Every structure is written in structure tokens, then in C-alpha cells.
Amino acid sequence: MFTPRLSPTVSGYAMPSIWPVVPIIAGDATIPAVGVRLAGEPLTELILSRIVAEINDNPILDGITISGGDPFYNPFALLALLRRLKEETHKNVWCYTGYTYESLLKDETRRPCLDYIDTLVDGPFVQSLFDPALSFRGSSNQRILHLSKYR
């Protein structure tokens, strides 16, 4: 899943922050979205239900990756999305963010999201540290943190 919103200070990402933040419906509450879209459409409760069903109906899928933009741009919507995906699919969740793990731990609004992420790839993409030989990350300052190993 791609979340298109970026912090204004982030540069060098392949996808610019061009889409507006729109609401998604999560459970009984309307929550400001992270800007998640499916084929350019806002992620609604109906679409998310279909995505969950497709994930659960596909035996070859073993995980979900959330990237962007930055998924942590709107932590309240991210938490609702992660909770729903994790609880209803029980899949391994990877998440890419420009924030560092340490800064997320210190942030009371973003920290709860970490409970639903199995693997976090943290740190901003830095063009001067780009290395095409790296697995699962774009620049050498980014770390792959297997959070589920410590729960």
C-alpha cells in the first residue's frame, strides 16, 4: 500500500506529495487518512474490506508492505489501517518511513503504530547514500528493524 503524503522537508523520494489528505472510514469512526489511495481513489471502508478479503483469499501472499510518501505522516489513520490489516489478515507487515525508530518511540502519537509492524525500514532516503546493491532499502543510512523479534 502506498501513502502519498510527505513531510515538506523530505526530498529525493520517487513520488511527490501531490494528493490531498482525505478521510477514510475505520470501524465506527471517520479518521483523517494518510492519503491512501487505490488507483487514485480514496481508501474507503468498502475498498479496505475488499483489500482485506483479497489478501485473505490469496494463499501466496505472506505479507503487506506500507510505503510512501511517509505512512507516519498521519499516525491516527495509519494506526487504524495497521490495526485492521493486522487483526483481519494476520500477515507480516513491513513499513517504510523517513522517521527513525528512536524518534517514533519518543512520539506518543506515532509509537502505538509500531505494535502492528513486524519489520520497520527507517530513516530518510538520502540520494548521496543511494546504493542499488542494498536489499529492501534505498540508501545506506536506512535500517531494517525486525520489531516482531522483540515482542
Question: Which residues are covered by each model-predicted region?
Answer:
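N-terminal pre-triad scaffold of radical SAM enzymes
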Residues: 1-32
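Short secondary-structure boundary micro-motifs
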Residues: 1-4, 48, 118-119, 128-129
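Conserved Radical SAM active-site core
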Residues: 4-5, 12, 32-113
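Glycine-centered flexibility motif
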Residues: 10-12, 21, 63, 90, ...
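Hydrophobic pocket-lining residues within nucleotide cofactor-binding pockets
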Residues: 22, 71, 125
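Auxiliary Fe-S-binding modules of radical SAM enzymes
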Residues: 56-59, 89, 98-151
